[in-house]
Curated annotation (Swiss-Prot):
This is UPF0304 protein Asuc_0543. Gene3D superfamilies: Helix hairpin bin, yfbu gene product, domain 2. Belongs to the UPF0304 family. It comes from the Bacteria.
């Protein structure tokens, strides 16, 4: 993270103020303030990672994934014979908090702050899948997009999407 001296001073002061406003996290803010004031490049890079930017395409893929899971749920609920797919397989796992943190943060923003997709967001561990899921969801989306009726899926189409 490249910053001018003035920018570092402003950011350091912001961290100091946050520590005063949020005593429960004062140590974290004090550490960040020390890093910024000191200009410690290695630690600044780690701080910069807290501000991962998502491209429009990445945001859209997360939204499309949520929409796909909504379609899977709606389609499953409309089926008369549900024996071939368990409801557990239709649960959205989320994203890996370690390797896919930026996607998980966006997911939490969409579902928490924006309040969208609440009807089926019952993931365990705060939607931390504890394993990378991006590639799996991308493959599932490819299959879903090729289905002629995205929200009226047959049991075979549901299975094909889940098995992608």
């Amino acid at each position: 993270m490249e910053m001018t001296t003035t920018q570092r001073l402003i950011l350091a002061n912001q961290y100091k103020l946050m520590g005063l406003l949020d005593p429960a996290n004062a140590k974290t803010y004090a550490r960040s303030e020390a890093i910024v004031r000191g200009g410690f490049s290695l630690e600044l890079k780690a701080l910069d990672n807290e501000f991962n930017n998502l491209s429009v395409e990445e945001c859209q893929t997360v939204l499309d994934t949520l929409e796909m899971y909504k379609a899977l749920q709606v389609s499953y609920n409309n089926l008369t014979d549900k024996a071939e797919v368990t409801e557990h397989r239709l649960k959205f796992a989320g994203y890996c908090a370690v390797r896919e943190k930026k996607y998980l943060n966006y997911l939490r923003f969409i579902t928490g702050t924006e309040g969208k997709y609440q009807e089926f967001m019952h993931c365990e561990h705060g939607c931390d899948s504890q394993t990378p899921m991006w590639d799996k969801y991308t493959k599932m989306l490819d299959v879903w997009r090729n289905c002629p009726h995205g929200y009226h899926l047959s049991i075979q189409e549901i299975q094909k999407i889940l098995n992608a």
